[in-house]
């Protein structure tokens, strides 16, 4: 009887908890909708006023005391602050005013800096929101930059990401470089993909890319590889010379491989000699990627080097060598030249790639030379 009573009581308690949870969720949804409506209403009310002030700053006019007080009142209340941040986020994509947001926000620097201590103690979600908005405001002050640098060491990966992203959005190259060195020395990591996205914000900046190239050797291996990966997407030609010099001196295999990949995507006439040398590297990964990259640097000298690599002991090196050769010189004469040699593995890999690239030519050659070809078991 006691067991039945216990089970019945537990069931009632379980149903009660579920019922209360459902009521709470519904209440929270309604409360959120009400808050959103209030923020939307405030956004409509203050939008024109904020935009007028920004346009005034754009024309090099100072804001009046009343205009500054108007915005300060907005910033001191939670809901109106949310509405304000939405407007600033929208205007940051407006070509007419986007570059003057930082000048406009300097008028309210004291209020923003006073909130740093409060948000430093908040949970990661609220802290992320505040940090993200610092990036929108684009204010470069010692207190703000110092706070963002401290946030790079936060336990939350989202806080770390938003901190680095905001430093990048503020746009001070020296502070961004300082942040990267700090992260490297303290082994602070964020997701690789978002790290490259942040670096890519500066892909058109000659000055910052030159600084990134200058400090590469000060950074840890992983960060170097990610930055070199990012370099592949920009068109700063001076990077080619710098990375070629680094390739000649670099001893770390991972870094070297990323530089070789860079030269596959970014043609540089001076690089082909070094790429040919890499076909004799002690690391098969380097030999394989160099063989693939040489497809973009094709010449008589490159072809002869790749023919030798068809005999490499590693299958991937042979595969990439055959692919590079046939991509540039898929002729019956060249194929027969390789097939007439004694190396069985060179013949096999060339036929394997040929079958995938040009099945018609493969069948012709196979039928014509069938008696001469001995495939390995």
Which residues does each PLM region occupy?
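N-terminal signal-anchor transmembrane alpha helix of single-pass membrane proteins
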Residues: 1-40
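N-terminal topogenic membrane-targeting module
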Residues: 24-120
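Amphipathic alpha-helical scaffolding segments comprising HEAT/armadillo-like alpha-solenoid repeats
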Residues: 68-72, 105-120, 141-152, 173-184, ...
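Polar helix-capping/helix-linker motif
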Residues: 73-81, 141, 154, 164
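Membrane-interacting alpha-helical segments
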Residues: 85-87, 117-120, 124-127, 286, ...
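Structural detector for internal amphipathic alpha-helices that build alpha-solenoid repeat scaffolds
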Residues: 90, 96-106, 128-139, 161-172, ...
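Short inter-helical turns and helix N-cap capping residues of alpha-solenoid HEAT/ARM repeat scaffolds
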Residues: 122-123, 155-157, 187-188, 219-220, ...
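Eukaryotic acidic, Ser/Thr-rich intrinsically disordered low-complexity regions
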Residues: 339-377
């Amino acid at each position: 009887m006691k067991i039945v009573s216990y089970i019945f009581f537990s069931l009632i308690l379980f149903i009660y908890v579920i019922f209360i949870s459902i009521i709470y969720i519904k209440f929270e949804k309604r409360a959120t909708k009400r808050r959103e409506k209030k923020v939307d209403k405030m956004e409509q009310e203050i939008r024109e006023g904020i935009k007028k002030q920004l346009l005034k700053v754009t024309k090099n006019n100072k804001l009046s005391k009343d205009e500054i007080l108007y915005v300060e009142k907005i910033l001191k209340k939670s809901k109106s602050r949310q509405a304000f941040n939405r407007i600033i986020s929208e205007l940051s994509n407006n070509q007419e005013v986007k570059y003057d947001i930082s000048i406009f926000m300097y008028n309210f620097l004291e209020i923003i800096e006073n909130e740093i201590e409060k948000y430093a103690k908040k949970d990661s979600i609220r802290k992320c929101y505040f940090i993200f908005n610092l990036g929108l405001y684009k204010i470069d002050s010692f207190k703000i930059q110092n706070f963002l640098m401290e946030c790079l060491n936060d336990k939350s990966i989202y806080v770390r990401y938003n901190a680095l992203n905001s430093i990048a959005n503020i746009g001070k190259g020296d502070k961004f470089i300082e942040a990267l060195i700090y992260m490297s020395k303290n082994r602070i990591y964020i997701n690789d993909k978002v790290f490259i996205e942040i670096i890519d914000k500066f892909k058109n900046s000659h000055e910052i890319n030159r600084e990134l190239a200058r400090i590469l050797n000060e950074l840890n291996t992983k960060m170097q590889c990610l930055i070199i990966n990012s370099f592949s997407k920009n068109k700063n030609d001076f990077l080619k010379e710098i990375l070629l010099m680094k390739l000649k001196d670099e001893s770390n295999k991972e870094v070297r491989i990323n530089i070789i990949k860079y030269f596959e995507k970014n043609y540089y006439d001076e690089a082909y000699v070094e790429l040919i040398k890499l076909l004799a590297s002690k690391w098969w990964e380097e030999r394989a990627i160099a063989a693939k990259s040489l497809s973009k640097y094709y010449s008589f000298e490159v072809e002869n080097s790749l023919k030798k690599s068809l005999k490499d002991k590693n299958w991937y090196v042979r595969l990439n060598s055959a692919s590079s050769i046939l991509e540039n010189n898929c002729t019956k004469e060249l194929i027969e030249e390789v097939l007439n040699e004694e190396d069985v593995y060179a013949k096999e890999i060339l036929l394997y790639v040929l079958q995938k690239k040009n099945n018609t030519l493969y069948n012709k050659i196979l039928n014509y030379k069938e008696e001469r070809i001995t495939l390995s078991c």
